[in-house]
Amino acid sequence: VYLLRLYSVYAYLTSLGLSVTLLFGVAGQVVIFMGALAGTSAYVAALSSLHLGLSPAVASALGILSGTSLGTGLVWLASRWDLRGIQVGILTLLASLAFEALILGNRAVTFGEVGFSVEDPLALMGLGASSALRVYAVAGMLLTSGLSLALLGMSGGRLWTLFRAAGEDPDLLRTNALDPVKYKAIAAAISSAIAGTAGILYAYSTGYVSPSAYSVVEADIPAYIVAAMGGLGNPVGALLGGVVVLAMRELTRSV
């Protein structure tokens, strides 16, 4: 059981690392909001099930849509304002802080810093706790490996090249009648959807949602370390980066 739960953490952090790999390592956007996007998706999914009675499938779709829309909108806005580098980082960091303030300031709805238990959709289907953990572990494995292979397949292709050009030399794209804002937004949409999916899967696999799991310290910083250890822009390397980060977390926790 411990190893299965550990793999849930690995899948979560590695997926966020893959999001950073695409949006920062390739598209050149310094973003500090992956945890907030994952948290937005997880909270929207969990709260809509709790307060509105939506089914887990509908709630999850709504959660992913919320996180994806938020991430895409912020990057699109930053690009329209021609913000670059640390300016984008500041904007997205403010969004992360706003997310945390929203969660902590609306305890009647979000239960504040304490968080709340999430109803496991697999338990509703009759699966036991250990069986559900195995399913989530397999889902996490498929998510991380599938995303890594998908991004690897994109690398070197036209869209990948346009993502990189949009981040490194947007003026060059404009001279070729291509809109860099469009390609930054597409990269943001893909990355945000990955983060949102990871956030929801993590919430269901742990059975709990709390703001600490989606904070800058617990999510964004490890995600950047995962991406950096994989060699920014290398999706396969991020899988190994996730192993290193998880090992470091466990070793420091035991000290």
Where are these regions (language model features)?
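Transmembrane alpha-helices and adjacent helix-loop boundaries
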Residues: 1-255
